[in-house]
Amino acid sequence: MLITQIIMKQIRDYPIVSTISIAVSTVLASEVIWKLVQCSRSKREKASRVHEVIIFNELGEICAAVHMRNSSMGSQKPQVSPCCNTHCSLRNVAKIVEQIDRAVYSIDLAIYTFTSLFLADSIKRALQRGVIIRIISDGEMVYSKGSQISMLAQLGVPVRVPITTNLMHNKFCIIDGFERVEEIRLLRKLKFMRPCYSIVISGSVNWTALGLGGNWENCIITADDKLTATFQAEFQRMWRAFAKTEGSQIQLK
């Protein structure tokens, strides 16, 4: 009661100072509450982020006939009908497609060979959503039979390759990499950003029918901040190093 009386007396005696003090206190309290909300939200988001190892092996295709019977004509996504095969290749591909379909701002793909129609369709959907896509590939494999890279280049996706006979043998994809998203924010002068978080997809597997459905391969999908930052930094380095090849060395066939 005494404290309340003292506060009221201060307000009467010093109305301007008291008003400013109350306003500042309210703002500070709001900031603290907002930070707590952000912290709580961040913890929930991190807990729900993906960290998964996908294994491809000779057992992945034993259920292929069932999926073919249950698939719809012209579908652009893997039709994963109920399947008891824990090694199902189609389910594994669907997990990669799911992450690409979640891309908000950027996809940076460094891939040796890329012929998968399902994954190419998911990249095209991202392009239609306004996602900025960049591809680094091998100078020879961009022309391999069934390569989807030339097709994506025709749609406006910039493609770069090394100026060397050494192989560009990487197989990784960064989705909404923090550094890249910040670059896009500054480039587009965006004031409000949609929620997103960085994902990296990497492993031994090429994005081909055989790699995704017959070979013994592995693929890691993770939202680990350090890993995504490391892959993003290497992509950025290669992108700058191969700058001369964009639009000049890639001749569409």
Curated annotation (Swiss-Prot):
Primary subcellular site in the record, as a coarse category: mitochondrion
Keywords: Differentiation, Hydrolase, Lipid degradation, Lipid metabolism, Meiosis, Membrane, Mitochondrion, Mitochondrion outer membrane, Oogenesis, Transmembrane, Transmembrane helix
Species per Swiss-Prot/TrEMBL record: Drosophila melanogaster
Protein name from the UniProt record: Mitochondrial cardiolipin hydrolase
Record GO cellular component, one term: mitochondrion
Keyword presence, Nucleus: no
Effect of A47D: In zuc(RS49); produce some eggs with a more normal eggshell phenotype in addition to the ventralized eggs compared to null mutants
Single GO biological process annotation from the record: oogenesis
GO terms, molecular function: cardiolipin hydrolase activity; identical protein binding; RNA endonuclease activity, producing 5'-phosphomonoesters
Organism domain of life: Eukaryota
Membrane topology listed for this record: Single-pass membrane protein
Enzyme Commission number, as recorded: 3.1.4.-
Enzyme class: hydrolase
Effect of H169Y: In zuc(SG63); produce some eggs with a more normal eggshell phenotype in addition to the ventralized eggs compared to null mutants
Protein role: Cardiolipin hydrolase present at the mitochondrial outer membrane required for piRNA metabolic process. Acts by catalyzing the hydrolysis of cardiolipin (diphosphatidylglycerol) to form phosphatidate (phosphatidic acid or PA) at the mitochondrial outer membrane surface, promoting the piRNA metabolic process. Plays a key role in primary biogenesis of piRNAs and is required during oogenesis to repress transposable elements and prevent their mobilization.
Subunit structure: Homodimer. Interacts with miga/CG12125.
